[in-house]
From Swiss-Prot:
GO biological process: cell adhesion; fusion of sperm to egg plasma membrane involved in single fertilization
Keyword list, A-Z: Cell adhesion, Cleavage on pair of basic residues, Cytoplasmic vesicle, Fertilization, Signal
One GO term describing the cellular component: acrosomal lumen
Predominant localisation class: cytoplasm
Official protein name in the record: Bindin
Prosegment residue ranges: 20-244
Pfam families attached to this UniProt entry: Bindin
Known function: Species-specific sea urchin sperm protein required for adhesion of sperm to the egg surface during fertilization. Bindin coats the acrosomal process after it is externalized by the acrosome reaction. It binds to sulfated, fucose-containing polysaccharides on the vitelline layer receptor proteoglycans which cover the egg plasma membrane.
Domain of life: Eukaryota
Organism (species): Lytechinus variegatus (Green sea urchin)
Length: 462
């Protein structure tokens, strides 16, 4: 009898030693869950085969169990055990006929609590193709690696998306072209009235930024048409802006003809003359009584650029007057291109806040080009345009305007060089006898045409 008692005591001692640090079976009911509730202590693990609610694990027991083995539990119950047991550090998931789904929720729950899956090399995950995986069956180790990689990628995408949303505020980001400082002025600070992007509005008549943009783009010429490209729109019907690089040497065939002298008794002929020097002077037309030509003045024949009240109409004056008449048509094209004085004043006020000098006549297409250049070098004004689409349109218009100005400069230089190479001889002032007296028979060609002597005074031909 004594020997049997000794064996029982030794067995109890060995069982206690095998329990190590895990809560062992003792007389205290809180040390280990009871088997009749679906959990018990087994090989240093708390082994549970019921759901978390059915096992009736108290918070006190859950805060003491650090190693857990689950049997017959689907993914949802495994996640519940992990999240409810605060002291858990290791977990073993036994299949025992229960197949875990290929869902990364289980991996995310373990990573959030810092729990290790001790049997990840033996546990198999099946039916993964139904969840979009490339393989149908895999062990838990590669499954954990893939889920963690997916989570890192999702976090990176979320951070980039949040950063893009935070940086999309136009009032906070730096100038789109200079990139130095955020826009200093806001429209609401510039004008306490009702504002709409570029123009402040306190009247019944509205002038939004799109109208201002359409006004600018309506005066800008389209690309010049060529004989080989029919897709390029022709701007001959529209009023082109003034040339910044005028042809001050010899005119091209499209320039305004000056002078117009001819031999007596012959039909009138067109003689092109330098714009600034005056054309053939003297007897013209059909031989008038006092030598008045086709463009004759009060006394003499058709005067050139230097001809005064005696020599006839001034060539440059006619050319400038013609250009000004063309520019004045802008205010009546379609009835929508003229900006009212009030709106112009609003634009001046807005541009004045950004220290931009606005030209006096905004309806002049040449000054519109200056305004576009001002806008291009003052990006803060662009940042104040609230509508991204309108802001992009204005920026595109400025870029195209600058390209056309560069083309004008290149074309002007090239035309002047060609004119100097191919120019005829300079026309003189005409014979003094012919220019002043039609009856003397002078002033018929003025040594024009084949390179005669300039300023040849008083030669009378014929």
């Amino acid at each position: 009898m004594a020997r049997q008692l000794s064996v029982i005591l030794v067995a109890l001692t060995l069982t206690t030693a095998l329990a190590e640090n895990f809560p062992t079976r003792t007389s205290a009911p809180s040390d280990c869950p009871q088997a009749d509730q679906g959990c018990w202590c087994h090989k240093n693990f708390a082994q549970c085969w019921s759901t978390y609610d059915d096992s009736r694990l108290t918070e006190e027991i859950g805060s003491r169990i650090t190693r857990l083995e689950l049997l017959y539990q689907p993914n949802e119950e495994v996640v519940t055990y992990i999240r409810r047991m605060s002291a858990l550090r290791e977990i073993r998931i036994s299949e025992d006929g229960m197949s875990l789904d290929c869902s990364c929720d289980l991996v995310d729950a373990m990573d959030d609590k810092g729990i290790t899956l001790v049997n990840q090399d033996e546990l198999e995950i099946r039916n993964c193709r139904q969840q979009g995986w490339s393989r149908d069956t895999m062990t838990a180790r590669p499954f954990l690696i893939e889920c963690r990689r997916f989570r890192i990628q999702d976090d990176d995408r979320r951070k980039r998306r949040d950063a893009e949303q935070d940086s999309d505020d136009v009032t906070k980001r730096a100038s789109p072209r200079k990139g130095d400082k955020p826009a200093g002025h806001k429209l609401k600070d510039l004008a306490p009235k009702d504002t709409h992007h570029l123009v402040s509005i306190d009247d019944v008549e509205k002038h939004p930024a799109t109208d201002f943009f359409n006004f600018i783009s309506g005066h800008r010429r389209t690309r010049r048409s060529t004989g080989t490209n029919e897709e390029v729109s022709d701007d001959s019907g529209r009023s082109a802006r003034k040339k910044r690089y005028g042809n001050m040497n010899y005119p091209q065939p499209m320039n305004q003809p000056m002078g117009g002298g001819n031999y007596p008794g012959q039909p009138p002929q067109q003689n092109y003359a330098p714009q600034g020097m005056g054309g053939p002077v003297g007897g013209g037309g059909m031989g008038g009584a006092v030598g008045a030509g086709a463009m004759g003045g009060p006394v003499g024949g058709g005067g050139g650029g230097m001809g005064g009240p005696v020599g006839g109409a001034n060539g440059i004056g006619e050319s400038v007057e013609d250009e000004m008449s063309v520019d004045s048509d802008y205010s009546s094209l379609g009835g929508e291109t003229t900006i009212s004085a009030k709106v112009i004043q609003d634009i001046k006020n807005l541009l004045g806040a950004t220290k931009i000098d606005l030209p006096v006549d905004i309806n002049d297409p040449y000054y519109l080009g200056l305004l576009l250049r001002h806008l291009r070098h003052h990006s803060n004004l662009l940042a104040n345009i609230g509508d991204p689409e309108v802001r992009e349109q204005v920026l595109s218009a400025m870029q195209e305007e600058e390209e056309e100005e560069e083309n004008d400069a290149a074309n002007g230089v090239r035309e002047n060089v060609l004119n100097n190479l191919n120019a005829p001889g300079q026309g003189g002032y005409g014979g003094t006898q012919g220019g002043m007296r039609g009856g003397a028979g002078g002033g018929m060609m003025g040594n024009q045409g084949m390179g005669g002597q300039g300023y040849n005074q008083g030669y009378m031909q014929g």
